[in-house]
Structures are given as C-alpha cells and as structure tokens.
Amino acid sequence: ALYNLMSHVDFNLGVYYPEGGMSGVADGIAELAEELGVEFRTNHPVEWIHGYRGGFKVETGGETDVLADVVVSDADYAHTEQELLPPEKRQYDADYWESRTYAPSAFLLYLGVEGDVEPLAHHTLVLPSDWEDHFGQIFDDPEWPDDPAYYLCVPSKTDDSVAPDGHSNLFALVPIAPGLDDTPEVRDEYRDLVLDDIAQNTGVDLRDRVVVEERFSVSEFTERYNSYRGTALGLAHTLRQTSLFRPPHRSDALDGLYFTGAFTTPGIGVPMCLISGEITADSVLEDA
C-alpha cells in the first residue's frame, strides 16, 4: 500500500521538472549552501575517516586533511563503512553487506540526435508483453535481459535549453542486475539491441541520427560513486529493508558520524534522498 501511494503521486498528482535537468536540483542546493557560508572542496576523494582529538580527521590524499566536529557521509553506505573506517568503528561486517538485497543497476544510453522524436513524450515506458522474464533476470538469475523493459526520457520535449535547435536530447534506461560484467563488447551489443528495440516498438529510428552518445552502466556506478556491486539505487525496498530495518542515520559505532542518502530512511530516489538529508540534519542539531 505504501508504494502504491508513490504511483498515485507520479501518475495522478504529477511531478516537477527542474529547468536545465536534474543537475539543477544539486546546483540550487549548492548555491543556497554557499550563500549560507558552506565551502565546497571538489576533486578531494576521501580516503580515511578516524577519530582525532575529540572530533574527526578526514584524509583526502591532498595536502591538507580536514578536521571536523562531526562527519556526514552521503557516499555509498557500504563503501564508507568497509573502506573508510577502521574495523572497530564499523557497524556492519562484510557478511552483512553481502547478504543484503540490492536494487537494480542500469544500462543508460544518453543520446543527442538530429530532428524530433515524435511520437515520444517526455516520459515513455516500453514494456514487453511479458516482463516477468526481465525481472527474473534482475533478481533471480542475474544476466543481461534479452527482451528488456525500459524507460525513455526526452527532456527536450519540455525544456528547450537542453538541446540545440533541430535536435533532441534523450536517454534510455534499462534496469539490470547489479554486479553484471559490462565489458565494452557487451555494451556495444546491448546498445544496438536497445536502439533496434526502440525502432521496432515506438517507430522512432535513432540509429543513423546520433550526434552525441554516452553510456553509463555498472562500471561507472562502481568507479564514479563507489557503489556496492554497481547498484544504481542502493538497498532494495524489501519488507526487511524498509523503514527501521534500513541502516541508521546515526552511527552506532562512532559518535559524531552520520549517514544520509539512499541506503537510509526513507529510501531510494531523489525526493527520498532529499528527505533523508533533512532527517540527518535534524539528528546532527539534536545531538549538538
């Protein structure tokens, strides 16, 4: 019933689109934070977090480590615990993370193409007549789906700023099992499969119109975001991984360490992660 409410919001109440794309949400938050005195240090990957003189020292591999009273991690929860903390300060061991059920990864195909893409709307779902095989290939017998269900998004249908005149901006998102091997050869084959399927099922042939193309899949989720097994979303919303059964915002093993993001409550998705940030901020203030 809880997740049916989410479908009601999406399909009946409608959703908002940030002008310029989803990065506009992050840009807006960053702009507000800087107005409030926050300093951002980019390209400083965190390598270690440990207690230091009643607070924390965060080692970034740069010339200057960061000293802090509290630390809030929005990184992959498993990565923070397993790779950035000493063993005695971890809440969970490797067996815990290995035994969790993870939400799908994804094969994402980003395209800039010549011309329009009628009749595609801003949001289009393409579903095979029987999608059980696809979901079985995600959760039961992990492998690349041979007849996939997928989502098409065409932001240029709504926002003129994301594509030049006479062109369209779109992406295809195919849910896949986390941890799959996505070699260049596999990605090439799957790219062709997706474009063929789009042409067959929507009547929109993009194959000879591509001007710009990027691909993003398991490897990128792992390398760019340190995502456990390359999941795109974190812990799946199973009954035993919902609400209080998700990892906490406050570390039980290290006072002053907090977590936020998709692994925590309320869960996965941009709105959920923003709410998670509010919960974590309230927790920090309560403990101050």
State the predicted function of each range:
Residues 5-58:
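Helical element adjacent to the flavin cofactor pocket in flavoenzyme catalytic cores
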Residues 114-222:
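C-terminal segments that line or cap access tunnels to active or ligand-binding sites in enzymes
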Residues 72, 111, 172, 198, ...:
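Hydrophobic, well-ordered secondary-structure elements that form the walls
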Residues 51-55, 86, 183-185, 217-230:
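Short glycine/threonine-rich loop-to-helix capping motif typified by GTGT followed
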Residues 262-285:
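A conserved FAD-binding loop/helix module that cradles the flavin
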Residues 47-164:
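Mid-domain catalytic core of redox enzymes
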Residues 50-51, 285-288:
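Active-site-proximal substrate-binding core of FAD-dependent oxidoreductases
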Residues 145-153, 204-266:
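A glycine-rich dinucleotide-binding beta-alpha-beta segment and adjacent secondary-structure elements
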